[in-house]
């Protein structure tokens, strides 16, 4: 991602922090995770975020082999709707997203197209949803299927 996407990165970081989801960052990033604009985009959630960095996509896939993990690849080319997966009994779920401009690498999609690709249904008017919106939609579907386990049910900011 280049610098014009710092708000997208901040939104993704905030979604991960507020849902207790680990954020895996795969290098090369195209940005520094300590730059002021990234922290500003992540608001006050950046220090509450669990981050794991990987030197490359290959290193990530070696550490977390898709065949041995509950791993899905989010893409507009996906064979399965993200809501058709039963996440409810999965302890750990990995959802990989590609670059905002290009998506996931073609070789990866070809390898896992029939088994592990998921998509968000949308009208064919535009290329895709904003990346941070996609992350939020799929993350909350996983949480919904798990009955929002460990999530706060009622706001703590008002007396009920």
Listing of model-derived features with the role each one plays in the protein:
Residues 1-160:
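Post-transcriptional modification and biogenesis factors for structured RNAs
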């Amino acid at each position: 991602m280049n610098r014009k996407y710092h708000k997208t990165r901040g939104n993704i970081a905030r979604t991960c922090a507020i849902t207790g989801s680990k954020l895996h960052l795969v290098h090369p990033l195209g940005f520094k995770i300590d730059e002021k604009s990234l922290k500003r985009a992540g608001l006050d959630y950046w220090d509450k975020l669990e981050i794991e960095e990987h030197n490359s996509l290959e290193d990530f896939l070696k550490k977390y082999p898709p065949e041995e993990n509950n791993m899905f690849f989010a893409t507009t080319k996906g064979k399965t709707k993200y809501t058709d997966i039963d996440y409810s009994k999965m302890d750990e779920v990995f959802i990989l997203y590609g670059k905002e401009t290009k998506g996931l690498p073609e070789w990866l999609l070809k390898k896992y197209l029939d088994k592990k690709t998921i998509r968000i249904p949308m009208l064919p008017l535009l290329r895709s949803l904003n990346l941070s919106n996609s992350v939020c939609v799929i993350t909350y579907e996983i949480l919904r299927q798990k009955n929002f386990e460990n999530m706060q049910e009622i706001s703590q900011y008002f007396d009920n």
